[in-house]
Structure formats: structure tokens, C-alpha cells
Amino acid sequence: MSARLKVVHVGKFYPPYPGGMESHLATLCGELVDDVDLRVIVAHDGRETVSETVDGVPVLRIGTAAWISSATVNPGMAAAIRGSGADVVHLHHPNPTGVLSYLASGSRAPLVVTYHSDIVRQRVLRTLFWPVQHRFLRRAHAIIASSPDYAASSPVLRRHADRVRVIPFGIRPDDAGTPDPATVAMLRERYGARVVLAVGRLVYYKGFDYLVRAMDSVDGHLVIVGDGPMHRELERLAAEQGIAGRVTLAGRVDSVASHYAAADVFALPATARSEAFGLVQLEAMAAGLPVVNTQIPSGVPFVSRDGQTGLTVPPRDPAALAAALTRLLDDVGLRTRLGRAARERVSTEFSAERMARDTLALYHEAAGRPMPAIPTSRPE
């Protein structure tokens, strides 16, 4: 029997550090750790380098010497990649620090890249990084896109279309945790019987300002779980519209699962391609919630399909958002049917097990090794 592949993941950060890329990386590595010799190399938000094991996954957090805008400077990362002895390097992008460290490492291991999103808003960084990014992507054996929609709409991925493989992101059934019945009952009593839930960082591309405006004409209570720089702006907007009593900015919560269980409808009113996939949609769908999302050129409307698992409306359109939310809140039969289909779609199309299996096959292809037989289900 041949030795297991040694796979090194290079990311930005790793949980408990929050973020969509970080959540995906943890889910994927949690599924792969029994099938490959796995190690994760990421930045540490402190100056020291820390080696630890997180939920069975070996993680090396390289000390940060400085920050340039939102990017870290980690002088030890290139040496860590070079000394890893990897059979395959899997880098999660956009990640300027990881890309520069990989190129500086001189690694000759086959490269797999998960392309989480384009660099959208940081125009200076995008311009300066453009030639380096394409040099890096030309080195890749394969570039994973999370949806066919994003692969088709990204100018970067179109330039490297011959290397692009679509492997949708997946989740485990318990990724959001387990709802606590007492907490669910308390939330229902607090917010009432018509609850619209949104989850995410309070940043511009989530479109939460349009969602707050929409609630002016929706009979229901909006709960937004998450924090970020737009908190005060959203509070002010709700107050100006006279609906502060029906809009709750909950911040970070102990039990996201309980909030999903207490909600009737989930909303992701994204306005920009920075929202490349919308993993929170999967969590909501797994909880049996129909989704109201937006028709943006990314994976968002691919995850939850209009008329199948929810309703899709134009971006930046509070009236359309309000109409879709009201339709679902008023029609329990439609809400139940779409929610049931949403749960089934996650189970069949977006499982973490399926994502890991397809990724593992790609590793073996890149390394030129045959794919071993993998049990169809893992023992408990």
C-alpha cells in the first residue's frame, strides 16, 4: 500500500478566527484529515508562531510581523511551505500573503487553488497584484471554483478556464450547531411569529441596508446575527424609518442554530460579487428555511434556486425584497414546500462529504497517483 498523500493547505487564518474562507477551510480539512497526511499553514494574528491541533487538524499559525491594509506580513510562511515536504499544496485565494509566500518558497509540489472570490473593491491592491496573481494561477494544476456561475462571471477565472474545476462548497449537518429548545422558545417569544433572519458580517456587500429598508413594508421582525463596521449605520436607518422595535442587530450569538430554528425566512440580499457563494445560505437551507437572495453574478443564486428553494430578486431593490419576504411569510404552504426542498438540496448537492471526495480525487490526479477506494460513509 502506498503512503498517504501529504497535503498542505495554505490559508489566511483558521478558526476560531471568523470568516467564510476560514469556515470552509475548517470544514474541508475536517473531512480530509483521515484520508491524507494533512497540515494547515496560516497567519497568526499575533507576532509569535504557534503550532497546535484544532479538532484533529494540525495547524501552524505563522507569526505576523506587520499588517499592510488587510493583508498580513509573515516572513516565516515561505520557509514553512518549503519545509513541509508536501505532495500537493492547496492554497485558498484571494490571499496575497499566501501567494507571495508560495512563490518565494520555490515549492515544486503540484498546486491546487480554491478561488474563493475576485479582489473586488480594493482597486489599488487588485491592480498591483494582477500580474503576480496570473503568474501564480498559471502554476496551478487545477483551480477550484465554488459554482459554475462564478467561474463564468469572473474575469480572472475566464482567463484560466482550462484549469477551472467546479466543486461546490459543502457543509456538515451540524456545522451551525444544535438548536436549544429553550433558546428557540425564548427567541420566538421575543420576536414573534414572523421572523426574518440574516447572518453575516455587517459590511457593504451583504446588502443589509436594503433589507432594513425593505422591512418598513413587511409585517415581521428582522434579526441580523453578526457584527461589523455598518452596525451604527443600520441602527440609524432602522430608527429613521420608525422600525427600530422590529429590527434587532443581535451581534455575535452563542447559538446560531437556535436562531435558524426560530426563524421563518432567511435573507441574503447581497449587492456585489464579493459575496461569491454565501455559505450561510447552506446553513439556513439545512435548517429547512426558504431563502430570499439576489440575482448577482456570483454563486449566490446558484446555491438557492428561484422558485425551487426560495425566491430570488434584483439586488438593491427594497420593494422587491419586501414583496418576496411578505409572500413567504403569508403563505405557510409555499414556505414549507420551499424549505423542505432547500434541506434536500443541501443534502444531495452541498454535503461536506461530497466536496471532500471530489477534492481528494483532484489531489490524486495532480500528484499522478491512483485514487484509493473510499468508504461511501464513515463510521460514527
Segments predicted by a language model, with ranges:
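N-terminal strand-loop element at the rim of the active site
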Residues: 5, 9-19, 23-70
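A conserved mid-protein helix/loop that constitutes part of the nucleotide-sugar donor-binding site
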Residues: 23, 27, 194-217, 229-235, ...
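Short His-centered aromatic/hydrophobic patch
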Residues: 91-98
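A short, active-site helix/loop in glycosyltransferases that binds the activated sugar's phosphate group
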Residues: 138-176
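Active-site donor-binding acidic/aromatic loop of nucleotide-activated sugar
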Residues: 230-233, 244-253, 259, 311-312
